[in-house]
Amino acid sequence: MTKGAPRLIGLTGTNGAGKGEAAAYFAAKGYARFSLSDVIREELERRGEPVSRDNLIRTGNALRERFGADVLARRTMAKIGPDGRAVIDSIRNTSEIGYLRRQEGFVLLAIDAPVEVRFARVALRGRDESAGDLEAFRKKEDQERDGGAKAQQLEASMAAADRLIVNDGTLEDFHRRLEEVA
């Protein structure tokens, strides 16, 4: 790690842009890995509901509505603790960002890539992404861009980032861009 490396690295960005790869990169550098979506997955498992993209969005919005827009960040920070070093994936709400900015040593990265590249990556995952073609993928993404105060606010979250990293080249190119952060 370089001197002055952040204690907490937050990741926001579009679906298939490389947030998971960025989280894995920082984990290999010694950061504990957390995802705000894990809080939602735990809730879905508790309810016995399948973990699908639609269920993650719906349940995340319901949790924010019931417990406050920053609930996912609060629950995740409770696991990290005040002195932990972590990379935090799946940040999609400005209240989550506001809460995390109050933590010492927090930096937010927005990860993006061209939509066609992201769609191809998502298709390779083999997960239920609820988008069978590029048009459906774009439509689903539009729903995530600005869902209101207690929903997903992807566009505002990306605009709040300290740095935008475009992942449109090789894996090595992406890692070089990430290395500048840690």
Where do the protein language model's features map onto the residues?
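ATP-binding Walker
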Residues: A17
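P-loop (Walker A) phosphate-binding loop of NTP-binding proteins
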Residues: T14, F26
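Small-molecule kinase domains that catalyze NTP-dependent phosphoryl transfer to phosphate-bearing small molecules
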Residues: D70, R125-R177, V181
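Extreme N-terminal, non-catalytic leader segments
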Residues: M1-R7
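Conserved phosphate-donor/acceptor-positioning beta-strand/loop module used by diverse small-molecule
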Residues: D89-S90, L100-G132, I165
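Walker A/P-loop
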Residues: G20
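ATP-dependent small-molecule kinase phosphotransfer cores
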Residues: A32-R102, E129-S130, L134-R138
